[in-house]
Amino acid sequence: MKRLVLETTAPFQGLPELVAFDEGLFQREGLQVEWADREPATAKMIQANLTSPSEVDPFASHGRLFEQGQADMYNACEWGNYCRVQATGKSGRQVGRRAIVTYSALVVAPHSPVFTPQQLANRVIGVPFYFGTHYIALHMLEGFLPRHEIKLCSAPNGSRYRLAALLSGEVDAVTLTEPHITLAEKKGCRTISSAFFHGTE
């Protein structure tokens, strides 16, 4: 049986792999899949002083264990993986689009004065640089605002951390994925814009 070590994934981006693992589908195909946990080393807080992707490591989360030789494969957003493939030290490459399309939303806190994308001009938006939710924030806002009025800062990987930062008032808006979009709405937050994006393996 061939052994394959995958970096851990989340349901919003890797549900097919998680189901295949739980249902024994990999084993039926002769693959012994193991998971390498990338979560413990990832940042969990807003870094408002970091306002550009050039100020952070593209391998801070996705691809980190692959680059260290501790995983054979990982999935992440297509745009971030273009950057990672360019910066790889291990001849990493994209082998194809992942089997799931991700839904993302730009969300504000319950008492925010923001109701439209235009009102986010010069307000701090927390995004995880090199992630799909970073690039989709730009796509969602550039139709409404000139680029110099879009103010991004480094936010943690993981919607739960970004939602907590939003609710505590650390940022004016964040990008989220499910199930945290629904959780945010249940807490009174408002979705300002939403869109879908691809990822790759």
Segments from the language model and where they lie:
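Short, glycine-/small- and polar/acidic-enriched structural segments
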Residues: 2-145, 149, 153, 172, ...
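Pocket-lining segment of extracytoplasmic ligand-binding domains
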Residues: 161-201
